[in-house]
């Protein structure tokens, strides 16, 4: 991609966009946008970023407003450089997954109605294997998976598929070293329990509703809730009012576009429909930009796809999601045995997959503590959040961030990815003093 429309600056790095066919039979192809590292890409690791949903585009969120180098302008007609882009530290690959999300497609129409966890992991593994044939310089390069929200399923499931593929075939071209997930759907029981507790302790819902949620919704699947649970979720949404459940202390986007999304837990299963801060309407800007014909042409989008309206999140995929594991904790146990670097992080103002949910899920893993709970500090010497190290897993909170941590706290998110990739703890005050 030489340039994208509305790019009024020169980029110091190369970037590529296009498709990889993951099934000839189904005519299924996944869309990617790949950014080389800004400096010395040959020495930097490869990173895959996935957004959640299920049904949300990593191009819309990951590139357009979170960790990508190009963020969409408020007029939806151009892009500006993100000073905290993660391609400062890695070569970063964004994938629209599964088929039917963003610019990804399938010629088999039934595919869009039959997506689920298992096929998503299989297709993503095929994607990576074929993508590395196209970019062979990244074969055996240190490789990490990252993502947020429903990627709490995608990422560990894909990591498991990669490790099992290694064992079955001896193919080591995907050199997976670890993964990191944020505000991640992990375990339905602990996630629900943590959400209801968070909503109650932050004063969003009444005592009575809190009790009813725990009775009727705790043991529910995230994707398939019962009518009884739905009814109480509606009450909880009404009580909480018109706030952004993805970032409970910041203003909502005041436009017709935003009205449905601010219903707290109205649709818990849309765990990837991101909240957006500072400019609470960032998602709206992406809708304008990625529907522009000239943008689609620059990104080599299939012209047939360009004829239908591009969406940040697909309601059709979300409502027709087939298999959804109730818990991925058993996968964590398996992957910890492989010695992978595993980090979880939480923006602490998200009510959709809040910090409490992740803490309950980690507690259920019963891992011994290696480094006790303590504050970590950003470059300005302010508390960036809190962290605890376990045997096989590291947990980090990001103070004041919502569901999309890199959108709300971009500087702190860059510190987070730097620490993760270096395999070192989050900085403490003494680190900052020694740097002065």
From Swiss-Prot:
The protein's GO terms of the molecular function aspect are: serine-type carboxypeptidase activity
Task: Supply the residue numbers of the propeptide(s) excised during maturation.
Answer: 257-270
What EC class does the entry list? hydrolase
- What Enzyme Commission number(s) does the record list for this chain? 3.4.16.6
Kindly list the cysteine pairs connected by disulfide bridges: 56-313, 217-229, 253-281
Name any one Pfam family assigned in the record. Answer: Peptidase_S10
One GO biological process from the UniProt record? proteolysis
Question: Which GO terms of the cellular component aspect does the record hold?
Answer: vacuole
UniProt entry keywords in alphabetical sequence = Carboxypeptidase, Disulfide bond, Glycoprotein, Hydrolase, Protease, Zymogen
Which ranges form a coiled coil? none
Give the positions the UniProt entry annotates as the active site. 149, 350, 403
Q: How is it modified after translation?
A: The linker peptide is endoproteolytically excised during enzyme maturation.
Where is this chain glycosylated? 107
Superkingdom assignment: Eukaryota
What's its catalytic activity? Preferential release of a C-terminal arginine or lysine residue
| Cross-referenced PANTHER family | SERINE CARBOXYPEPTIDASE-LIKE 29 (PTHR11802:SF32), SERINE PROTEASE FAMILY S10 SERINE CARBOXYPEPTIDASE (PTHR11802)
State whether it acts alone or in a complex, and with which partners, per the record.
Answer: Carboxypeptidase II is a dimer, where each monomer is composed of two chains linked by a disulfide bond.
The UniProt family comment states: Belongs to the peptidase S10 family.
The name under which this protein is listed is: Serine carboxypeptidase II-2
Please name the source species: Hordeum vulgare
């Amino acid at each position: 991609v030489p340039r994208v429309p509305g790019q009024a600056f020169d980029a110091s790095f190369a970037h590529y966009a296009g498709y990889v066919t993951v099934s000839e039979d189904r005519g299924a192809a996944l869309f990617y946008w790949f950014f080389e590292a800004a400096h010395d890409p040959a020495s930097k690791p490869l990173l895959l970023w996935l957004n959640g949903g299920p049904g949300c585009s990593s191009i819309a969120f990951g590139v357009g407003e979170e960790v990508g180098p190009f963020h969409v302008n408020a007029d939806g007609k151009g892009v500006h450089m993100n000073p905290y882009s993660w391609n400062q530290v890695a070569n970063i690959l964004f994938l629209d997954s599964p088929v039917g999300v963003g610019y990804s497609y399938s010629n088999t129409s039934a595919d869009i109605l039959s997506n689920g966890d298992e096929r998503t992991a299989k297709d993503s593994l095929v994607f990576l294997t074929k993508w590395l044939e196209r970019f062979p310089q990244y074969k055996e390069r240190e490789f990490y998976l990252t993502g947020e929200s429903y990627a709490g399923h995608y990422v560990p499931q894909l990591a498991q598929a990669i490790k099992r593929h290694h064992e079955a075939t001896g193919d080591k071209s995907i050199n997976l070293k670890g993964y990191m997930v944020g505000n991640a759907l992990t375990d339905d029981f602990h996630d629900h329990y943590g959400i209801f507790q968070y909503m109650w302790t932050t004063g969003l819902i009444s005592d009575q509703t809190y009790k009813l949620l725990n009775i009727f919704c705790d043991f529910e699947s995230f994707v398939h809730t019962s009518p009884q649970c739905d009814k109480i979720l509606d009450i909880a949404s009404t009580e909480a009012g018109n706030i952004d459940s993805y970032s409970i202390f910041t203003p909502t986007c005041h436009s017709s576009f935003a009205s449905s999304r601010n219903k707290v837990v109205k649709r818990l299963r849309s765990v990837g429909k991101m909240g957006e801060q500072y400019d609470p309407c960032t998602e709206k800007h992406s809708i304008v930009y990625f529907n522009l014909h000239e943008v689609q042409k620059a990104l080599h989008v299939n012209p047939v796809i360009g004829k239908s309206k591009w969406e940040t999140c697909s309601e059709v995929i979300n409502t027709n999601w087939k298999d959804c594991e109730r818990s991925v904790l058993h996968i964590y146990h398996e992957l910890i045995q492989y010695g992978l670097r595993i980090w979880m992080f939480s923006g602490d103002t998200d009510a959709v997959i809040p910090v409490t949910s992740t803490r309950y899920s980690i507690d259920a893993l019963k891992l011994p503590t290696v480094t006790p709970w303590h504050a970590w500090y950003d470059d300005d010497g302010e508390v960036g959040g809190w962290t605890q190290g376990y045997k096989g897993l590291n947990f980090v909170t990001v103070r004041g961030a919502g569901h999309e941590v890199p959108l709300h706290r971009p500087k702190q998110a860059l510190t987070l990815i730097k620490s993760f990739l270096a395999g070192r703890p989050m900085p403490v005050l003494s680190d900052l003093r020694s740097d002065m």
